[in-house]
Amino acid sequence: MNLVAPTPWGLFFQDSATPQMEGIEELHNNIMFYLTIILFSVTWMMITIIKSFVNTKSPISHKYMNHGTLIELIWTITPAVILILIAFPSFKLLYLMDEVMDPSLVIYGEGHQWYWSYQYPDFTNADGEFVEFDSYIVPESDLEEGTLRMLEVDNRVIIPELTHTRFVISAADVIHSFACPSLGIKCDAYPGRLNQSSVYLNRQGTYFGQCSEICGILHSSMPIVIQSVSLKNFYYD
């Protein structure tokens, strides 16, 4: 089983576990390709121009050059083409992420100061009530060996792999944000409003996230732990 969590001095993405996060990472890499070319091209041109002026003996060698049609066309059209090449994949990914799928499982999550509560409206307990629970951070004094400080919770969200799952997010008091980087989720939680995000986990594993909206003094004490299991274990365990 995979364990995906932040690492000290981490500079790159966490391992993606959903198609939407794979799309985000691919878009990022494509944009970085264009930005790298732009960086080196502009740097080369600036250095070339500076060296040209430094090596020119006459300080008025370009006195009568007040415009250049060709270069103006180049620096107008080239950025426009680059922006189009960036925009189309970005819009495609944006609309794919917003596409409403018919989920096999719905989980309702509500942010509180400073914990999360979850409800599985598709399941009921012996009393006929919806399955629901609260998820609090595990205090540092209660951590077991091998668990993660400021990220472990007492009750994890369990979802099956290879299943379309919809998270419906809200808040009970102030604005929160339900975020799990490896799943490509960042869903704002507003009091009195419902927001949603769909996921499709490619593999089993444990994935860590946090509240990503400053919500008070214990904002950093609202971790999110999502554990993906097989469909059989989800229904029978």
Curated annotation (Swiss-Prot):
Known function: Component of the cytochrome c oxidase, the last enzyme in the mitochondrial electron transport chain which drives oxidative phosphorylation. The respiratory chain contains 3 multisubunit complexes succinate dehydrogenase (complex II, CII), ubiquinol-cytochrome c oxidoreductase (cytochrome b-c1 complex, complex III, CIII) and cytochrome c oxidase (complex IV, CIV), that cooperate to transfer electrons derived from NADH and succinate to molecular oxygen, creating an electrochemical gradient over the inner membrane that drives transmembrane transport and the ATP synthase.
Mitochondrial intermembrane side of membrane: 1-30, 95-237
Pfam families assigned: COX2 (PF00116), COX2_TM (PF02790)
Lineage: Eukaryota, Fungi, Dikarya, Ascomycota, Pezizomycotina
Residue ranges of coiled coil: none
Molecular function via GO: copper ion binding; cytochrome-c oxidase activity
Record's bilayer topology term: Multi-pass membrane protein
Ligand binding (Cu cation A1): 176, 211, 215, 222
Assembly mode: Component of the cytochrome c oxidase (complex IV, CIV), a multisubunit enzyme composed of a catalytic core of 3 subunits and several supernumerary subunits. The complex exists as a monomer or a dimer and forms supercomplexes (SCs) in the inner mitochondrial membrane with ubiquinol-cytochrome c oxidoreductase (cytochrome b-c1 complex, complex III, CIII).
Needed cofactors: Cu cation
Cellular component annotations (GO), alphabetically ordered: mitochondrial inner membrane
Entry's EC annotation: 7.1.1.9
Transmembrane segments: 31-51, 68-94
Alphabetically ordered keywords of this record: Copper, Electron transport, Magnesium, Membrane, Metal-binding, Mitochondrion, Mitochondrion inner membrane, Respiratory chain, Translocase, Transmembrane, Transmembrane helix, Transport
Name this polypeptide is given: Cytochrome c oxidase subunit 2
Positions contributing to Cu cation A2 binding: 211, 213, 215, 219
Signal peptide: none
Binding site for Mg(2+): 213
Note describing how the cofactor binds: Binds a dinuclear copper A center per subunit.
Catalysed reactions, as listed in the record: 4 Fe(II)-[cytochrome c] + O2 + 8 H(+)(in) = 4 Fe(III)-[cytochrome c] + 2 H2O + 4 H(+)(out)
Subcellular location per the Swiss-Prot or TrEMBL entry: Mitochondrion inner membrane
Mitochondrial matrix side: 52-67
Family: Belongs to the cytochrome c oxidase subunit 2 family.
UniProt GO BP: ATP synthesis coupled electron transport
Organism this protein belongs to: Trichophyton rubrum (Athlete's foot fungus)
